[in-house]
A protein has these predicted regions:
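Extracellular loop and loop/strand-boundary signature of outer-membrane beta-barrel proteins
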Residues: 25-30, 66-71, 81, 127-132
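Residues that define the transmembrane beta-barrel architecture of outer-membrane proteins
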Residues: 34-40, 76-80, 136-140
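C-terminal beta-signal and adjacent terminal beta-strands/loops
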Residues: 63-64, 86-148
C-alpha cells in the first residue's frame, strides 16, 4: 500500500502570441498528472509443485489527474493479471498469462491537448471524444523460453 502526494513546485509560465493574445499556466502545488495518490498491489502466488507456479497480480491506481490544472481526471481502477508458469525441464519453460481478467474498461494517462484546460472550462468537454491511452483489453498470452 502506498499513499503519496507529489506536487509541482515553481511550475508556471506565460506566453504572448504575435496577435497580442496572452496565455498562462500555473501548476504550483497541484498534484502531478498521471501519478495516483493511492497505490495498492497484491501479488499472491502458489507453487503447486516445484515446477508449476500459479500467480495473480491485482494493482489498484487511485484517482489520477490527466492534465496540469487538475481539471480532468480518471477514476480509480484495478489492473489484473494472472498466469501459470511451468518449468518443463532445465531447458524449457512454458507459460500462459491472462491480462485484465476482470475485463475492466477505461482510460489512463493523459488526454492529448488538455494541458491548459482549467476546472471552469472542463464541463464543456463532457460527452466529447478525446484521445488518450486505454487499459489493456482482456487477452490471453502464451510464452515459451528455451535455454541452451
Amino acid at each position: 500500500f502506498t499513499y503519496q502526494k507529489p506536487v509541482y513546485k515553481n511550475y508556471s509560465a506565460s506566453v504572448t502570441f504575435n496577435d497580442g493574445t496572452q496565455m498562462g499556466v500555473n501548476a504550483n502545488n497541484m498534484i502531478v498528472k498521471e501519478i495516483p495518490q493511492t497505490l495498492i498491489e497484491l501479488d499472491p502466488s502458489y507453487n503447486i509443485t516445484k515446477d508449476l507456479r500459479l500467480w495473480l497480480s491485482f494493482r489498484y491506481f487511485g484517482k489520477t489527474y490527466a492534465n496540469l490544472q487538475e481539471a480532468l481526471y480518471f477514476n480509480g481502477r484495478w489492473e489484473t493479471f494472472g498466469g501459470v508458469n511451468w518449468a518443463v525441464n532445465k531447458h524449457l519453460d512454458l507459460g500462459v498469462t491472462v491480462v485484465n481478467f476482470l475485463n475492466q474498461k477505461g482510460a489512463k494517462g493523459t488526454i492529448s491537448g488538455s494541458e491548459l484546460i482549467t476546472k471552469d472550462e472542463a464541463s464543456q468537454y463532457a460527452g466529447c471524444y478525446m484521445s488518450g491511452s486505454y487499459l489493456r483489453p482482456f487477452t490471453v498470452e502464451f510464452s515459451a523460453s528455451l535455454r541452451f
